[in-house]
Amino acid sequence: MRYLKTPHFIHTALPLVVTGFLIAGVADARTISYATGYPPQSIGAEAGKAFADAMEDYSDGELMVKVYPQSLLSFSETPSGVRDGMADSGLVLTPYFPSEFPSTNLAAEISMLLELTDAPAETAGLAYAGAMSEYLFNHCPECSGEFEAQNQVFIGGGGTSPYMLLCNTPVRNLEELEGKRVRIGGAQWSRWAEDLGASPVSVPQHETYEALSQGVVDCTIHSAPELTIVKLMEVVSDITTGAPGGVFAGVGNTVNRDTWRNLDEQQRSSVLHASAVLSAELSWGYAEAAVENMKTAERLERIDIHDASDEMKVRTREFIREDLDNMASTYSEKYGVNGADEMIETFKPILEKWVSLVDGVESGEALAELYWKEVFSKVDVSGHGL
C-alpha cells in the first residue's frame, strides 16, 4: 500500500410492517425503519441520512426511510433485531458474530491484503468496500446464505481508512514494538501484534481512551478517524503509519428478508441504489475524516507522526502472506468453511480491480455512482435474497 504525502482528495416477532401513509402528491408511500449503532452526527449516522435521502429520490417518493441512530438497536443487537423485525433494515458488523457470518468474515478479515497492493492509503477503504460488495453479491453464495439464515438480505458493505498504530510512546520499528501492550480490534491485528513481538490486549473501543491515558496499553490499532470519534487525539503522543495496515470491512447493510419480499422489483432496485449511496458515504466519510485528522495531528506539537521502518513493513508483508495460508485452514477447522483457500484466491483479483477503479474518485457522489454502475445495478432483484 502506498501512503501518499499529499492527500489524494480533500473536500471540505413479525417483521415490522413497511408502513403506508400519504405524502403530498404521492399515494401509498412506505416507510422503512433503519437502525444503526452509530451515534447521531457521526460518520455512520450521516451515511444513514444519505441512505434515506437517496431512497426517497430513487423511488420517486414511494419508499421513505426513518433512521434510528444508536437508539432502536445497538451494534450488538442489530442482527437479531433486523432478523426479528424490530427494524426493517440495519447496519450489521459481522465480525462481532463469528459463528453466524464465517464466510463473510473470512473476506473481511483478509483486508491486510491491501498492504500487498499499490493502493494509496487514502483510497484503500473505498477499494475494499467495493470489492467486498462485489464478492458478496456475485461470488459468495455461502455469504448470502449466512444472511438469509438470519432472515436478512445483504444489500451493501463499507470500509474504514487503514489501521495504524496510535500510541503514547514512539513505536517506529520492531525494537520499539517489542513487548508493547497493543489494544487490538480484530483477530488479524492480534495475530500481527503477537507475531511481531507485541502483546495484544482486548479493550472495548469506548474504554480505549482511558486505557491509553492511564498506561494500561501503550498503543491501539485504529484508523485515523478514531482520533476524533473516540477522542484519542487527546491522549495519543505518537502515530505510526504504514503498519499494520488493513481496514475494517466487516460491514453489512441488511434488510429484513420478509420486508424485502414485500417489495416489488422496482422498489428492490431503489433500495439497492440507495444502499450504494450509503456504502459510498460511509466509506468516503472515513476516508475524508482520516485525511482531516492526520492534518490536525500534524499541526499539534505534542503529537509526532512517524512512518513505520522498512524492516517493520517487510516483516508485516511476510506476516500477511503466512497468515493467509493459516487463515484458510483456521476457518475450515474452526467454522467449517469449505473451500476457504479458493475463496481467498477468488477475492484477490477482485480487490486488485477495485484498487484501480477507485483511483481518481474525488467525491462521495462519484464513488456512489461507481459502486452502482459496477456492482449494485447488476444485482438480479428477481432472485437476490428470495
Regions found by a protein language model. Give the residues of each.
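N-terminal secretory/targeting leader peptides
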Residues: R30-T123, Q150-L386
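Sec/Tat signal peptide C-region and signal peptidase I cleavage site
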Residues: L22-A29
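Bacterial N-terminal signal peptides that target proteins for export
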Residues: R2-L16
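Intrinsic disorder/low-complexity signature
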Residues: K5-H8, G25, L93
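Short, solvent-exposed loop/beta-turn-alpha elements that line the ligand-binding surface or hinge
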Residues: L114-A149
